[in-house]
Curated annotation (Swiss-Prot):
This is Small ribosomal subunit protein uS11. Pfam families: Ribosomal_S11 (PF00411). Keywords: Cytoplasm, Ribonucleoprotein, Ribosomal protein. The gene is rps-14. GO terms for molecular function: structural constituent of ribosome. It comes from Neurospora crassa (strain ATCC 24698 / 74-OR23-1A / CBS 708.71 / DSM 1257 / FGSC 987).
């Protein structure tokens, strides 16, 4: 008599994201760092401890001069939004950051397009906040006593 085959247990669905009810929003935090050299789109959970996904504009394009372009930022944001949907995150709070400190306090060209790409890809937008670091009193700015001469 041949040996009996062990009964296979029914396969369970394993979800990576949080357990939620239908129609409930699950928030994450999208931190967009837009300098004039590159754009970072970094999504974490609400506490900021666990990174869900991080994509950089320089990864999405080949030419160095295009790293900070709005197009590269848009591609990065679309990738991040797709990954968030896989994990069950449906809404994002946005924190936009420029270089700050002794650098410029104006976000680079990729900030606006990254935000628009997140919104157009179906993510609900919660709060939008500017978290550029501003010095209360810092080290001396470059340029010398008479400033930058053009």
């Amino acid at each position: 008599m041949p040996p009996k085959k062990a009964a296979r247990p029914a396969q369970e669905n394993i979800s990576l994201g949080p357990q939620i009810r239908e129609g409930e929003l699950v928030f994450g935090v999208a931190r967009i760092f837009a300098s004039f050299n590159d754009t970072f789109v970094h999504v974490t959970d609400l506490s900021g401890r666990e990174t869900t996904d991080r994509v950089i504009g320089g990864i999405k394009v080949k030419a160095d001069r295009d790293e900070s372009s709005p197009y590269a930022a848009m591609l990065a944001a679309q990738d991040v939004a797709a990954r968030c949907k896989e994990l069950g995150i449906t809404a994002l709070h946005i924190k936009i950051r420029a270089t700050g400190g002794n650098g410029t306090r104006t976000p680079g060209p990729g900030a606006q397009s990254a935000l628009r790409a997140l919104a157009r890809s179906g993510m609900k937008i919660g709060r939008i906040e500017d978290v550029t670091p501003t010095p209360s009193d810092s080290t001396r700015r470059k340029g010398g006593r008479r400033g930058r001469r053009l």
